Amino acid sequence: MRSVHFVALGDSLTEGVGDPAGDVWRGWAALLAGGLAEAGQVEFTNLAVSGAQTRDVLERQTPAGLELRPDLVSVVIGVNDTLRHTFDIHAVTTRLDEVYAAFTRQGTTLLTACLPDPGAMLGLPGALARPLARRQRAVNEVVHSLSDRYGAVHLHASGGTWLTDRALWSADRLHPGERGHRQLAVRFHALLADAGLATGRPPSPEPEFPTPSRSASLLWLATAGTGWVARRCTDLLPQLMRLAANELRHRAWGTSSRLDLHASAAVSEALAALSTPDQPEGGSADAGAQRRRTATNRTGVPGTACAAAGRSAAPTTAITG
């Protein structure tokens, strides 16, 4: 029996931050890999790097991943883009489209996810949190649309009760702990199994290692965790202050909805500017269309419907079930 090759692209979430296994990070992708096929029939390569943005995935991780010609590739990325002053939804859209298209041309199955708003996870005040939330919603809308466009197996992980279950999250409040990583792996496995793409035993939702003590978590947050947040947010802070001031002005004038409309329009323009996707190697237009029609998200709703539903789908699509 031919082995299944799974390649993971992304940032610290996919690298496994929050799920230590000995002296290294493990994470949801490694946990998922063990359930894709029977023991000894899976090859797993994790190319994710902490701090990566969509540019890094396109320029560095994708070429390395394409050389491996995987059967399955996960592309879970975008939060770090929202934490930079250079955030540009047009650039994010173009990069993700190029990454998805490159693997689709090889006939590789795409695995994607939309992600929580970092401002809400950090518990930032409203005026600071809303600009970040608007950015993350924009990224998620793009991921929804492109996942449908390329027939990806997509997990809606941006909302629901799992976001407020502290047992699932690490001390930094941005990364899942072991339980959270296991929840991601379990839910991704369920989607792949439904599509006939995972035949191994699903990952266990129960942790393998003891939960870090409160003192250990606080020590990590005060040292490595604080540094992690600072490195990713320092260049954003001056701009975030300006965004917050703008947020407060619009709120005082009763025109906050204009900011949301502007963000939605930018997403629509970015998606409209994309060219028609290429077909897989040896594939046909009909085959590509069939993949897009049959791709489903966590709720079993076709990708286009989930994208249209947007935030209203979040409460019923949490990955904690």
Model regions and ranges:
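Serine-esterase "nucleophile elbow" of acetyl-processing enzymes
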Residues: 1-50, 60-69, 270-283, 288-290, ...
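Structural beta-sheet core signal
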Residues: 8, 75, 111-112
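Oxyanion-hole/transition-state-stabilizing segment in secreted/luminal serine hydrolases
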Residues: 15-19, 54-91, 117-118
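Alpha-helix N-cap and loop-to-helix initiation/capping positions
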Residues: 23-24, 87-92, 127-135, 172, ...
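Substrate-gating cap/lid alpha-helix
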Residues: 122-156, 178
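Residue-level recognition of beta-strand->loop/alpha-helix junctions
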Residues: 46-48, 114, 156-159
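A short helix->loop->beta-strand "cap" motif at the edges of active sites that frequently abuts
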Residues: 105-109
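Conserved catalytic region of serine esterases and O-acyltransferases that act on ester linkages
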Residues: 149, 172, 179-321
